[in-house]
């Protein structure tokens, strides 16, 4: 029992550091953006109304939707939009048209994650460093250079992994939330009546009396729940209980106290709207607070960068992106990965965002629309999981999701008003990634269909070859095939040029599934083809690490004597030639061909030993 409690405590601390970093740094800019917009006159009733809207937004979207409902929709213990998409698409398997629509919606939501991934580090770090302006206006010119230096350091350290410093994330973030609570309480004691704003009465009265203003400010209010989707995305790392315990015991109380403290400060000093978070602190605490806020925003950004690596890897294994170079940064934790292309691509785009928008207030206009779209998509997918996956009655499904849908849609509609003020930026990024993903998926389908059309049946081919067998050489040849039962081009080239076959020949197909994990006991499916040849299907979930040599070690129990030192891996390196009439627009054909050309080699992706790989090229017209 003691060890279970200890484990729960460790996981809860870890969840506070990783899951809640983003939502925990929203206090830096959320209240400032609502009151600083000029749409809300400074009256006590308006302050009460806004604080009440903040509290009930946190309650409805985070406590009720994500913590109470969405966390239940785990995919074999895993969460995140891709896991939810896999659940929903499986649930409507017998409805192909609906499944196609849900897949497109889910992939679009996944693409928007990258748009959010650019804005979050930019606005978080920038808003923390803007505390320097509160210390002294002379620091104003240093804000952007300092932000860029911090961001560069953050991205430069990714290749070294975060295993060493990651253990400090939880404790630092706990200190951050404790400081949030203390700052809030220090102001609330001057206006304890501010706590009356916990009543929904004030939110409802504000919305009733100011419907137009309410609609406008929802675009800023949503900033208090940015990062809520991380609760679900990190489900597999920490589990439901630690995430829920962290939210209700530490995170939500600290956030509410801080927001209400900022409200109390504004009642005393409306001029504090220029930066209410930092102005709650005494002068002597400003420098330490800026340092702590910067650390908190770096941790929040780190969680998002790690999430970008993870989501990209999952998308690759589900066939929506080409192979990219993946480096493991930890020997003990295979989930610790580094993807150079994703890392520096994010960095360049984030730098562009900081230089273009130049302040957290300007970035706030760009923030929200991608998050709201993802929240809306999550609600839609949750409905289909509950209805068709869990088989709940339609009326109950509508009751469970309709309120969340209406709330999400209200925030989404409000954020559309920010489209031309900066909201276009994450949408352009998300749209570009979406185009890449659907182009790659469709291109691979066309390419595989072309390979099937030109394919030679493997079993018949082997029977014909062994009528007059070529020279056999010692060792084992592993031929990779896109689909089982067809002759790989690498084998045809090997016979044509080398005129030999190995003593043992394995025809290996990697089969990726829409589930997070497939255990080693279900990894291999082996069929003997005779002549010391085997068809081997290796099954992976989208969160499994691909390690072909390790998986093939199991074949020793199936009659094949596989020795690493005498095993050669034959790969086909195809060059795609775009042609007219493939079913894709000409520009998308060229885009697919370029993506195919630039894809990382299969050898690295499958963890094959470099000194045992033979690549043979061919050209394929699509």
Curated annotation (Swiss-Prot):
Membrane-related topology note: Multi-pass membrane protein
GO molecular function: potassium ion transmembrane transporter activity; symporter activity
Annotated catalysed reactions: K(+)(in) + H(+)(in) = K(+)(out) + H(+)(out)
Keyword presence, DNA-binding: no
Cross-referenced InterPro entries: K+_transporter (IPR003855), K_trans_C (IPR053952), K_trans_N (IPR053951), Kup (IPR023051)
PANTHER family xrefs: LOW AFFINITY POTASSIUM TRANSPORT SYSTEM PROTEIN KUP (PTHR30540:SF79), OSMOTIC STRESS POTASSIUM TRANSPORTER (PTHR30540)
Role of this protein: Transport of potassium into the cell. Likely operates as a K(+):H(+) symporter.
Family that this chain belongs to: Belongs to the HAK/KUP transporter (TC 2.A.72) family.
Protein name per UniProt: Probable potassium transport system protein Kup
The gene coding this protein: kup
